[in-house]
């Protein structure tokens, strides 16, 4: 499914508040809801500074070549890319193909976010997404699982999202810097 939600823009709104584009790739309804909670958190914490847009792509539609290409172009122009999946051994091949495609398009993203349902310390999906972020030279944020020494998962997730919001705020403050202002 491909959705776009943009608030009504006046020219002064667009100049005062830059757009923050978020692409979400998700496995199913449950993981889509998890990703939307993260998106809503960002809107809640940065919504007064940015205009938000999102595109959502379900994993299974990424198997269709034309749709995969559109989704890859969306990801390449996004500021944040969120991948939300159930924990498993590997991401589906159609998702890896989509990732490879948006990497070829030279992403402008600032961050890649991984959201998973598992509670394990070891995660092949987490490792894969971390390597993708490294190749793309972007920040990687991951929902914490059972990390050694961590007991409260909710506080840890809120801390991770808070850091993500701070990084995005810093990246967009740089856009306002210059002699033309």
Language model features with spans:
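Short beta-alpha junction loops
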Residues: 29, 59-61, 109-125, 144-150
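Short acidic, S/G/P-rich loop/turn micro-motifs used as interaction or catalytic elements
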Residues: 29-31, 61-64, 83-92, 118-121
